[in-house]
A protein has these predicted regions:
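The substrate-binding groove and active-site-proximal loops of carbohydrate-active enzymes
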Residues: 7-19, 58-71
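A structural signal for well-ordered alpha-helical segments within the folded catalytic domains
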Residues: 19-23, 70-77, 159-166, 182-185
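Metal-dependent active-site segment of extracytoplasmic phospho-/sulfohydrolases and closely related
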Residues: 72-109
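C-terminal cap/loop subdomain of S1 sulfatases and analogous C-terminal strand-loop tails that border
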Residues: 102-134, 148-153, 157-234
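Loop/turn elements at helix/coil->beta-strand transitions in domains of secreted/extracellular proteins
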Residues: 32-39, 88-94, 137-139, 196-200, ...
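Short glycine/proline-rich turn/loop motifs
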Residues: 2-10, 54-59, 144-149
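Formylglycine-dependent
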Residues: 1-36, 43-52, 225-227
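Active-site His/acidic residue clusters
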Residues: 25-67, 103-105, 109-112
Length: 234
């Protein structure tokens, strides 16, 4: 997936990706520990192709997909440990999320589906990645900030990742330029757990361009008679 720019000097080993980006993340945190910073940690786990490092192989009964999840857990743990070591954990906002719902068989022969067992990545929800149904568009979102967020809270408020732009701008006291991010709304209180305000609606789009509208209690998916964009999509 993707390409390498720079010829042979740019070659990388997939098995080393997690180590590499985690090391860069830790170096960034150490270099900026004395001032406010923003870090976006875009891991390749558990995306295909799944090539966890050898030390994580066989750690999970779900095969390479499960091992990649273990590797991702390690990466997150390394970052949290570094924040603790530097005394930054208490006053650091961490948001963990995904950009789409789950997919198991993504066209790679890695036995992800065969070894899944009774586990259902989308839970009781219908569909998955590529789909307009809930398992495709509803995603996990975890926020941690020991100094400001009371731990153990669970919210069923309707919010979109689009809203993080305006919400984090409000948190940092930033004034957005006129016309910037017009679809983003400030739901900082919802993110921090100080209230449970809902977005009135969210517009969603599947990979075949099917549009849907999600409100607090209802979802409308426009009818579509076209072919599936990918043969393995729900």
């Amino acid at each position: 997936i993707g390409y390498m720019k720079g010829g042979g000097k740019a070659l990388w080993k997939d098995e080393n990706l997690a180590d590499s980006i985690t090391t860069h993340a830790l170096d960034f945190i150490k270099a900026n520990k004395d001032k406010p910073f923003f870090m976006y940690f875009a891991t390749n786990d558990v995306h295909v192709p799944r090539f966890p490092h050898d030390r994580f192989r066989g750690k999970n009964p779900m095969g390479l997909r499960g091992d990649a999840i273990v590797q991702f857990d390690w990466s997150v743990g390394q970052i949290l440990d570094e924040l603790d070591r530097l005394g930054l954990r208490e006053n650091t906002l961490i948001i963990l999320s995904s950009d789409n719902g789950p997919v198991v068989d993504d066209g790679y022969a890695d036995q992800a589906e065969e070894l899944l067992g009774d586990h259902k990545p989308g839970g009781p929800l219908r569909g998955g990645k590529y789909s307009a149904f809930e398992a495709g568009t509803r995603i996990p979102a975890i926020a941690s900030w020991p100094k400001e967020i009371k731990k153990g809270q669970v919210s069923d408020a309707l919010m979109s990742q689009v809203d993080w732009f305006a919400s984090l701008a409000a948190l940092t006291g930033s004034v957005l330029p006129k016309g910037a991010a017009p679809d983003s709304y400030n739901y900082l209180g919802t993110l921090l757990g100080t209230d449970n305000a809902d977005r009135p609606w969210v517009i969603e789009q599947a990979s075949d361009h099917t549009l849907s509208v999600r409100t607090k209690d209802w979802k409308y998916i426009e009818t579509s008679n076209g072919p599936k964009m990918v043969p393995w999509g729900p």
